Amino acid sequence: MVSSATYQQSSIITDGNEMLDPENIYLARGPRYRLGAEEIRDYILTTSGLLNTEVGGPSVKPYQPPGLWEETNAGGNRGILTTYIPDSGDKLYRRSLYTFWKRTLPPPTMVIFDAPNRDLCEVRRQNTNTPLQALALQNDVQVLESARVLATNINDTILDDNEAIKTVF
């Protein structure tokens, strides 16, 4: 299915396709959509080469703003949930599928990108586009770290600026 011509079509609308199939009934073009919260994080990690694709195992604790968990504990001792200690090394870059969730405090970046609330079952996810999402992508610690790694890899392997630009884009 993934290797089919229909699946691999671009979402760019050409005049000819628009006239022949304005409603996209015949799948003349691919659909346009924003990736989900987990997909965005995984895509960023994959692009930089940091994604750890290990299957199974313990949950990952990605970066979160300092002090956030302590604010939701109401001063009590909640065992491993009292303080948040992000993972380090390869464990930090595991797929988002394995992200550790605290119901009262889901990962903020995931929430910004419409990750479901774990209190209720959601049949269909919301799909919003807000300025806050752009700010999160510009300021999130993991995004910035991935960008630095990608830039370092490009600078170390490609000397020609034009070739580096082509490779990245």
Question: What are these language model-derived features?
Answer:
Residues 1-3:
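Short, functionally critical alpha-helical segments immediately adjacent to catalytic or ligand/cofactor-binding
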Residues 8, 13-168:
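An acidic, gly/pro-interrupted, aromatic-rich
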